[in-house]
Amino acid sequence: MDLVGQNIANQNTAGYTRQRVETSALGAAGVNSRFSVGARPGEGVSIDGIARLGDAVLDSRVRDALGASGFWTAKAAAAATAEEALAEPSIDGLSNKLSKFWAGWQDLSNSPDSVAAASAALTSAQAITAQIADGYRAVTNQWSDARASVDQKVSSVNAAADQIAALNGAIRDSINSGGTPNELIDRRNLLAQNVARLTGATGKVETDGTLTLRVDGNPLVAGSQAKHLTVTGPQSIEAGAPTTIAWENGTPAVITNGELGGTLAVIAPAADGGVLAGLAKTYNDLAEALADKVNTVHRSGVTADGDPGGDFFAIAPGGPAALNLSVVPTGRDQLALAAPGAGSLDGSIADAIAGIGDLKDGPDALWNGGVASLAVSTAADKSRATAAEAGAVAATSAQLSVAGVDGDEEALNLLTHQTAYNAAARVLTAIDEALDILINRTGLVGR
């Protein structure tokens, strides 16, 4: 009944595994005699131990499923956040801003002398440069947050490894001394699941009751000893170098699973498929393509005063192109809208600039290709994350079907034990009544 109460009290405790008293019947005591002593009843019941009703195979399945789920969930969440920030397709997206920019040049080609059309084109250009810079900053901020989370995750793994090692020692000592370390095992399994979710670690219960956790094939925890992981790599997306994990002795630890593995994949360099670095590169490429294509045509024209056209966009050196893109002209008089010798009312250069938006290798095509690529990869990551999460839920459900506490079952067990106690009490009462008759009433006949 005490154990039933323990199960019921911990019904909602995370990681708790239900327990059961294991009993066996005691045989009749042996009697040394030259004569037959006849049939003898057994000596009752023996409590052999308190069993923890867990399943090591199901526990291992949960750890594996959590590792896969952690990886794809981390990747999908980062990709979805980046995709949402693009706001494509919508009126707030960069594609719409580019369309308005080219339309403004088309208006200028029709009305080269219009101050309003020139002002609209310049305003549209400034809106594009601002949105490119804002988009790039959003990506770099997301990258920095993800990079900081790598440090936090590694610290969490190291702390959990130390706790698991300490619990391993306590569990081993308890088993050797004949104790029941069930609650300690529950705490250890919960920590092991957290480590698996973060790193995709695999585990094996040894013959002495300790749990060995391995990351990248090497032991993170073995017995009462734990190893630590370290993080090296840049703190800025502009560095373009990978963030790596290593053991304390400097040996690389390749983590390709769990939330940590997913986050490392997200912040990887663009050449290695990093979604954030890839998006940052798209912003830089767009800024460079926009400046190159527009400046090439703009320099071929002349202003209303007949002066040669200069650069329309400028990219300041010493930093990312997306952040350093700016608009050079400040008014209509600095816009080169006409071809040389065609007159001040010619708008052929403006028309040529407007046509850049339709080029197959133009800024629009580059941006749309980057957005489409991100959308495809995000959809794939979301799909795999959904499947991995379903696998984790199924594995956890299977584990709980064996290890979880069922309130109805425990209530039935409590009633069973209560009935057994009542029956045992009735046996004692019957024996007491028989002894009373034997002692107090025997030999009274005839008095």
Over which residues does each language-model region extend?
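Structural signature of extracellular appendage/secretion-system components
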Residues: 1-447
